[in-house]
Amino acid sequence: TGLRIYINPGHGGWDSDDRNVAVAPFAQGDTLGFWESSSNLHKGLMLRELLEGQGATVAMSRVLNRTEDDLNLNTISREANEFDADLFFSIHSNATGTSNRVNFPMMLFKGYTENPAKPEDKVVAKILFKHLIENQVTYWTQTSEYVVGDWDFYPDWNNAGLGVLRNLTVTGFLSEGSYHDYVPETYRLLNMDYKYIEAWHFAKAVMEYFNTDGFTTGHIA
């Protein structure tokens, strides 16, 4: 397609800023269990394969899960800008941090919800949400569109917004694909086929946004 896509699999390195959810048979801290860094990376690598298969040029902020691969957020946005990406994805999953358990996708872009810093960020974020919510393998506790500006979502940050988006000049946003502390979803996110579905929906969103030829084969979930 000639497109240039930059993928940032969020977090990295099984470190203190990572997110570990202990579910049987994995103990807390077991790197074979659920860690957001691993899950994000798997999705990113599969998305890269899908996009490159369609002729896109793809750069990633990391391709391994080591401490040294967890780049500074300013470095990530600078790399995406210098790469002259047509689209930037920061891939994450979410958590409530409380005893409340919910599960739905959420898209965050720079600016106010009704006044994005870059209007195209919101356009493509809405497209991705539409595709992610099509996933019927999981259970969504709500299906209404959740696409919000980070200045509204973090009102106490004085319009600082998310670090990875702060200095981003190319079109892009951060996605929270689902809630990894919703235990059924935790188990699903340990399954490579399930993570592939999310990557597939990212690729579909790219195809729709850029109005490029779609895939010639489907994916049966």
Task: Please annotate each region the language model reported.
Residues 1, 52-53, 80-84, 98-101, ...:
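Extracellular/periplasmic catalytic domains that process cell-envelope and extracellular macromolecules
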Residues 1-79, 83, 103, 108-111, ...:
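Active-site histidine-acidic residue metal-binding/catalytic motifs
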Residues 4-9, 57-62, 86-92, 106-109, ...:
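Structural recognition of the beta-strand scaffold that forms the well-ordered cores
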Residues 11-15, 36, 64-69, 93-99, ...:
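Solvent-exposed loop/turn segments at secondary-structure junctions
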Residues 36-39, 43, 47, 60, ...:
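Stable alpha-helical elements in mature extracytoplasmic
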Residues 45-56, 81-85, 93, 129-138, ...:
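Sec-exported extracytoplasmic/periplasmic mature domains
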Residues 120-158:
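Active-site-adjacent substrate-binding region
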